[in-house]
Every structure is written in C-alpha cells, then in structure tokens.
Swiss-Prot record:
<comment type="function">
    <text>Bidirectionally degrades single-stranded DNA into large acid-insoluble oligonucleotides, which are then degraded further into small acid-soluble oligonucleotides.</text>
</comment>
<comment type="subunit">
    <text>Heterooligomer composed of large and small subunits.</text>
</comment>
<keyword id="KW-0963">Cytoplasm</keyword>
<keyword id="KW-0540">Nuclease</keyword>
<protein>
    <recommendedName>
        <fullName>Exodeoxyribonuclease 7 small subunit</fullName>
        <ecNumber>3.1.11.6</ecNumber>
    </recommendedName>
</protein>
<dbReference type="GO" id="GO:0009318">
    <property type="term" value="C:exodeoxyribonuclease VII complex"/>
</dbReference>
<keyword id="KW-0269">Exonuclease</keyword>
<dbReference type="InterPro" id="IPR037004">
    <property type="entry name" value="Exonuc_VII_ssu_sf"/>
</dbReference>
<dbReference type="GO" id="GO:0008855">
    <property type="term" value="F:exodeoxyribonuclease VII activity"/>
</dbReference>
<comment type="similarity">
    <text>Belongs to the XseB family.</text>
</comment>
<dbReference type="GO" id="GO:0005829">
    <property type="term" value="C:cytosol"/>
</dbReference>
<dbReference type="GO" id="GO:0006308">
    <property type="term" value="P:DNA catabolic process"/>
</dbReference>
<dbReference type="InterPro" id="IPR003761">
    <property type="entry name" value="Exonuc_VII_S"/>
</dbReference>
<keyword id="KW-0378">Hydrolase</keyword>
<dbReference type="Pfam" id="PF02609">
    <property type="entry name" value="Exonuc_VII_S"/>
</dbReference>
Length: 76
C-alpha cells in the first residue's frame, strides 16, 4: 500500500464533508462516507501530532547566533 500524504487525506476529508453536507446521499452511502471521513480525520490528526513533535523553534540570541529548541505549545 502506498504511503498517503497529509494533503491527500485532507482533500479526501474535505470531499467527504462536502458530500455529507449536500444531503443527497442515501442513509447507507452517508454511513460509508462518514466512516471514510473518520478514517481520514484520524490519519490527519496522527500526521499533525507527528509534525508537532518534530517542529523546532529557531531563536536568535543577543549575539546574533541562532539556536534551536523543541517546540512547546502554550498549553504545556
């Protein structure tokens, strides 16, 4: 199975939302679309969590040098 990219999964999720909001799907098709949407949302959430762990903030020191620190969200 090919590795899916975040952007691809997000686009699929947006398409599912559009279909569901359209109100044209049968109950069965709505459930299938909802299930696919949950799958794509979970994938996107996982990828965002992985990215957050990798983000580094570049800080400029008074002497002009730059250092890196691990990203710390404000709520931590």
């Amino acid at each position: 199975m090919a590795v899916e990219k975040f952007e691809t999964a997000l686009k699929k999720l947006e398409e599912v939302v559009k279909k569901l909001e359209g109100g044209e799907l049968s109950l069965e098709d709505s459930l299938k679309a909802f299930e696919e949407g949950i799958k794509q949302a979970a994938f996107c959430s996982k990828k965002l969590n992985e990215a957050e762990k990798r983000v580094e903030v570049l800080l400029k020191q008074k002497d002009g040098r730059f250092i890196t620190e691990q990203f710390q969200p404000e709520d931590e």
